[in-house]
Amino acid sequence: MEQERIMQRVQKDVRSLLIASKNGLSIQELEQDYRMMIGSQIPLRSLGYKSTMELLLDMPNVVQIHTQMDGTVNLSAVVDEATRKIADLVSCQKDRSTARSRNRRRNIRPRCPVDLVRRGRVSPVLPATVKSDLRDLLSLSPLLLSELEKAFFSRFGRSFQYTRYGFYSMLEVLRSISDIVEVKQTRTGSLLVLRKSETGHISASLCVKKSLDCQPAAVPNKTSCVFEKCLNEPQRPEKKPSEPATSLKISPPEFQKFSSQEPQSITSSRSFLHSSSNKEPDVNRNVSLGESKKSIENKTSPAVPSNNVVLNNSLVKNSETFESLFTRMSKPVSHVEADHANASEPNSSDLNWLEKKLEKELKLCLARKGAGGSVSDDLRSDIKHVVNQHSNGLNISLLPTAFKSFTGKDLPFKELGFMSVMELVGSLGDILCLESTDEGKDWKLFGAKKEDLVDEFSAGLRSTNSSLSSWNSTRQSTAPLKPVGTIFSKVDEKLWWGPLELKVCSTEQIDIPPDAVRNQKLHCLPRIKHSLMIGVYVESIESPSQFYVRCCGKDTSEKLEDMMIEMRHCYSNECVSERYIVPDNCISVGQIYALRVPGDVWWYRVIVHSIKNSELLDVFYPDFGNVATVKKSWLRFLKNCYMKVPAQAVPSSLPFVTSTEAQWSTQAIKRFRQLCSCLPLVGLVLQYVQDVLVIFLCDTSSAEDVYLHQLLIAQGLAKMEPEHACKKVSRNTFMHYLTPSQEKPQEESSKSSVPSESSQSEVLCTKETILQVIDEVDPEMPYLEAFPTDTDVWDENWVFSDGAGGSNTTPTIPKVETQKQENKISKEQKQPFKFCMDSGDASVVHRPLEEFYISLIKSSKSQESTDIQQSSHTEEQHLAEKSHRCTAEQLQGGSSSSMLCEKKLYYENKDLTYCQQQSKCSFSPLIGFQKLQIPRSATPAALGPAARLATAGRLLYWASDSH
């Protein structure tokens, strides 16, 4: 009742979806529309179906299935009386060109998890190896259709993915293999049964049967008694302890076929022979004691004849093989007695001949069991005849042409499920031999040397018959026989008895998924602009000079989190996790994989750094920068879709600081880790040195901005480097595992590093010195809003206009109010100050204001009580002369005077004196960066934490209005 209710609901929903579509829907579009309308997938499992096509085939009163010329399936609704009016309205709708193009595009690239192979009118063919696997699986026992995939996976270790071969459903697969598989309907469901034995086996059994039936009625009495006693008579061990009891078990294929195909004839002939067996003398046979019980058990069940004969060292003189028995049974009695009379000495090479024949028979059976078993006997004989016509061998590339010239037909290797002629020839190892040409560019085909096998077989029969005919002879052989042993011969590497596909798969032992990442490198993040402020998380700290940072933003940290969530959802599936297991022969240094440590729920991208032993290896986390030792069994192949996000960890270093000793102390490293733990910091990019990012770090979560490098110096854990410490940065050892970003690196500024004294003096010689005078009145400090540590401290989508913040391409000269201020500024300029940036850059904003993430709210101008008076023309001329005199003094003073600059420009605010305390023994932490001027006419707005960093570095100050 429940299934009927679900079926009625599904039929109603499917009908409504198909009626609403004028041009019909494909199967994928129907599944997508059903999921969008209902909110869940089509309940196939609840209704007992494996695919949507099977469900639609059982709804002929709802769905019409149309097959297009390109092989695609189009679905339309069956209109009834209740829905006829709606269908008429839908058919009257006007088609839109955009809708048609959209539908056509969907048909070309359907949105489905499996990209099915698009085929035309040619029906797909199941590969011969897969067909052989199905025949092998069903030969054990019949299987239900619902249990086929599970049984296939448990036996062969891989899933039965029929969609890879062009099939849309299991129904099409069963139709293509109807020659070997039969479907029977039972109460439990569809039962897959292997069809009866093939024509080759049947013909072999018939030949054996005819050889028995063609004998005269009076002849087989004596010969048949011998054959019957060999099968069913209890064995009596011979009292000769000096002879070893080494035995060999032989199962001739001919007799096995005979016993399995004609059990009734065996039983009837056995009963007839057994009635006359008492008239014959007892035949002594030496067998092992362990095998005598099996012969007795076989005697109790006459319907199942014995398939095995046990031979020992006395086999040459006291036993008889099946081949000799069949040969003797086809002879008259006179010939058999003549063979007994013509007894000869036993030969020690008989056992070697039996071993070789057994080995050849096993190889032939294995070749028949593989993909070559699907080739018919007629095709085998034709191929063999074509190859035998060329005594010097036939090139495998010329086989299709020679076959067509002989038979008038094309070589049907594709119809049999073989991908190439080489694969077909590889499956026919029982009739063909392959040899490489002298050049090694092609293969030559030779027919199997059956003549030699027949001669060897007949010679072995003659020697065996002559030795076995002396059963009742009293002569003893003085020559000792060698015990039977196992001979291991070196097999030629070019010889392959099975199909070529199995030879390729045997080297890897596991199927590597097609979307697994192999021999690829992860991309780095694109380089960040000089003087750009970013939010960072500090990861994997070794010292203040060696650590990793991870950028925060929608394109960096958020994408990484989304990718890790997808990896967790994907690899948590047991089937997916088992399929992507990395074998030991696929693990190599520098390759990227997926990893999950037991006890952790997240999957990470890792790169193998070194292999310690057979179980442990060192891996590098490209997204976090740390190195860990893990087990090989924890690795999984990384899917190719997880390579889009670049490596997030950026090797970094603090500039202009070094350790107080030869190496960084443990206390300094511990303190630096405490400052960086669990806090998003604001970083100001200085430059790149050997792929290492030199960056300033500032903690803006407290009331005052804290520069980490200055704090370490103040606490005595580090010292200021007088030279450029960034030049001494060592190259990161893990960067060769990554490849540069495909995006073009952002343009570096013209002043990517701290300007030297010589460069500053050159700039001062070519540019006019521009003095910026700041009002003596203490400027109003802007309100610095607090922000929580768990939120972003910037907005990447904020766009500013070029004119925001009073940016101007021409330098502005503030007017001088009084002579007192002018003298004061002139006095400060004469004081030497090192590492001062160019005064021309101080008044010019070369970069857009949005790089500093500062938002300024425009407001109406407020009238200032103390307006700056306009200077006269004489004052401007006096200012220009004073500027020219200042420049001349700097040129005469050399390197010390070339660094003169407005000290008040950097130390304007008297409240923030943290950096000023270190100015005697160091320089400004943000030397070389641009300064921003905020016009006094604008009311101060709520500046973000990034603006606070600029304010603490004296890059943001109030400028006087110029009228």
UniProtKB/Swiss-Prot annotation:
**Compositional bias annotation for Polar residues:** 257-276
Q: Note down the stretches annotated as region Disordered.
A: 232-306, 739-763, 803-822, 864-891
Q: Where is the Tudor domain?
A: 586-645
**InterPro entries under this entry?**
LOTUS-like (IPR041966), OST-HTH/LOTUS_dom (IPR025605), SNase_OB-fold_sf (IPR035437), TDRD5_LOTUS_2 (IPR037982), Tudor (IPR002999), Tudor_domain_containing (IPR050621)
Q: Report TM segments.
A: none
Q: Which PROSITE patterns match?
A: HTH_OST, TUDOR
Query: What domain of life?
Result: Eukaryota
Biased composition range(s): Basic and acidic residues: 873-887
**Protease recorded as keyword:** no
Going by the UniProt record, its keywords in alphabetical order are:
Cytoplasm, Developmental protein, Differentiation, Repeat, Spermatogenesis
Where would you say this protein principally sits, based on its record? cytoplasm
- Give GO cellular component annotations, separated by semicolons: chromatoid body; pi-body
Pfam families xref list: OST-HTH, TUDOR
The family annotation for this protein states: Belongs to the TDRD5 family.
Q: What is the stated purpose of this protein?
A: Required during spermiogenesis to participate in the repression transposable elements and prevent their mobilization, which is essential for the germline integrity. Probably acts via the piRNA metabolic process, which mediates the repression of transposable elements during meiosis by forming complexes composed of piRNAs and Piwi proteins and govern the methylation and subsequent repression of transposons.
Q: What is this protein called?
A: Tudor domain-containing protein 5
- Lineage of producing organism: Eukaryota, Metazoa, Chordata, Craniata, Vertebrata
Instruction: State which gene encodes it.
Output: tdrd5
